[in-house]
Design a protein with these regions (language model features):
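Structured, active/binding-site neighborhoods that engage oxygen-rich ligands
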Residues: 1-266
Length: 266
């Protein structure tokens, strides 16, 4: 989960086409690096999943509550228009989105459950709170599933094959092939596959983040998704863990510590 948060922070200065930097030789962290809505919602979903105790209806309500609470606590984190309206709606119904927000916030689901089937079920619940379009659900499930597979010892070829066979994403592309024509887009179907490819082509945790940002596009969300996967596969260097936590406010750090305690108890 902390890898996803760092990915968000690393990608934040390069979001949107006019800020994209399509090379890997950028400062990993700078004065412009900051957490965004991706981090806020990652923390919110983690707390909601813990409160939900693996029960679908309870989890739906808990995730909905936490997302609205944290979203209002951080009103200027960078939410989209539809999501912002949902945060303040009297009746917060899902609105059929297939945006990549469902995938950016789901990292904790890849860690909190003991089976792939349960991981997929809970990822679906977290998406359906807002992103109940099939592509929105698929993006969240694919992200959580890859995190689960990465942390449970599966190889990159195994992960690639699973994604292709289960979700139908095209994994037979390279970062060099994607980069020239890739632009800012916020759909799951045009962000999640690219984020997974950035991980598959990497040689380390940091290299995965650099791959993701170098593609361009919705760089903070892309790197957030990639970072969550890369942490599960490679681990995360202690100095980067420390630097990430230093850049977070106390309540988000507390949400992370609650998550870490829960995965330590399993």
């Amino acid at each position: 989960m902390l890898g996803a948060i760092l990915g968000d922070i690393v990608g934040s200065p390069y979001e949107f086409d006019h800020n994209n930097y399509k090379h890997k030789d950028f400062p990993l962290l700078s004065e412009k690096s900051h957490f965004t809505d991706d981090t806020v919602m990652t923390a919110a979903v983690a707390v909601g999943l813990i409160d939900g105790k693996g029960l679908p209806e309870r989890t739906f309500c808990a995730v909905q509550h936490e997302m609205r609470f944290w979203g209002r606590e951080y009103p200027h984190a960078g939410y989209g228009g539809m999501f912002r309206r949902w945060l303040h709606a009297e009746n917060p119904n899902p609105y059929g989105s297939f945006g990549d927000g469902s995938a950016m916030r789901v990292a904790a689901a890849g860690w909190l459950f003991d089976t792939l089937d349960k991981t997929l079920e809970m990822a679906k619940v977290t998406a359906e709170v807002t992103h109940n379009h099939p592509e929105g659900i698929k993006g969240a499930q694919a992200t959580a599933a890859v995190i689960f597979l990465a942390r449970t010892g599966h190889s990159k070829p195994e992960i690639k094959q699973y994604v292709e066979q289960t979700f139908g994403y095209d994994m037979n592309r390279t970062c060099d092939e994607i980069r020239p024509t890739y632009h800012h887009v916020e759909t799951c179907q045009e962000t999640v596959p690219e984020a997974i490819i950035a991980f598959l082509e990497s040689v380390s945790f940091e290299d995965a983040l650099r791959n993701a940002v170098s593609l361009g596009g919705d760089s903070d969300t892309l790197a957030c998704i990639t970072g969550g996967i890369a942490e599960a596969f490679y681990g995360m260097p202690q100095e980067l863990q420390d630097e990430t936590l230093k850049r977070l406010p106390e309540d988000i750090r507390e949400g992370y510590e609650l998550f870490r305690w829960n995965i330590g108890q399993r």
